[in-house]
């Protein structure tokens, strides 16, 4: 009798995606982050669902409903902090996943890469709207500042901002719609992730060497299922250490002050995972220019495949490109640090230099260094 796993229409899909999938024999731990992102998404959807059962999206009661969850709901505090810190883990995995793609040339699978960029934007939008929901000071002022950026769009900007707000300022209508969008987006992200996986399985996974691995494949199960489970255990361990020992480590103390439109916090800043983009935004004195730089800081990933000038796919055997890659990582860490600092000397100058370097590395230096490496190898 034929195995039902391979014949039943539903189990066949699961089988071909997670069990009998031919995978390269040499993919390293850097290939774990796809499954870890899936686990993060599941954790966020489940904790978010339970939070939504007790949360009220009204300006008068939003802050106290979050307090109620933490104080009165059974294990509400752990659900709330798992959700808040789960977002941080999500972004850590996202950044490492994108970094892996850049380092090993995975961006050459252009469909998978482009869906990935759309996913990144969707997750960033979801996280931003989620940060507004507790209705603390940083929630309110963060929402005001970031939505206000759209007013830089010529002609329609002001109308667009007021349309998004549902009034003349961030208020009850804004909070209600942000909650609605924050609830629906993770399900859209799930669908996009399935498409991301569909496109990936059209080509098969890349591997550290960047060389086609058709001649050396192993089944996904048990080799990579056990490897993914190990990664998942590390992820959950890290998340629970964060939740149980220092749940507010990555948050902002200002968000424990209820939102007050009459009192502006001294330093308005987003969550840590947006600081690099926020630093790029602030480093340009012009409002529209800053907004364009902010969008392009992520959108620049879309043109990376077009700028691939090397004859090798991966950076594994390209020491000069490796140096440049780690310079980019250092630059992003610098931008993250600058984004959390006040707008004063010398932080402004450092931010501007780091922003210029970021775009220089990706758009100019990487392609040039790749050509130099080709010539060094007499190709």
Curated annotation (Swiss-Prot):
The Gene Ontology terms for molecular function here are: metal ion binding; ubiquinol-cytochrome-c reductase activity
| Transmembrane region(s) | 33-53, 77-98, 113-133, 178-198, 226-246, 288-308, 320-340, 347-367
Locations listed in the record: Mitochondrion inner membrane
Cofactor(s) needed for function: heme b
What are the UniProt keywords, alphabetically? Electron transport, Heme, Iron, Membrane, Metal-binding, Mitochondrion, Mitochondrion inner membrane, Respiratory chain, Transmembrane, Transmembrane helix, Transport, Ubiquinone
Which amino acids does the record list as binding heme b b566? 97, 196
Q: Which Pfam families match?
A: Cytochrom_B_C (PF00032), Cytochrome_B (PF00033)
Quote the cofactor binding remark. Binds 2 heme b groups non-covalently.
Keyword check for GTP-binding, yes or no.
Answer: no
What this protein is reported to do is described as: Component of the ubiquinol-cytochrome c reductase complex (complex III or cytochrome b-c1 complex) that is part of the mitochondrial respiratory chain. The b-c1 complex mediates electron transfer from ubiquinol to cytochrome c. Contributes to the generation of a proton gradient across the mitochondrial membrane that is then used for ATP synthesis.
Any further remark recorded for this protein = Heme 1 (or BL or b562) is low-potential and absorbs at about 562 nm, and heme 2 (or BH or b566) is high-potential and absorbs at about 566 nm.
Q: What is this protein called?
A: Cytochrome b
Species assigned in the record: Mustela nivalis (Least weasel)
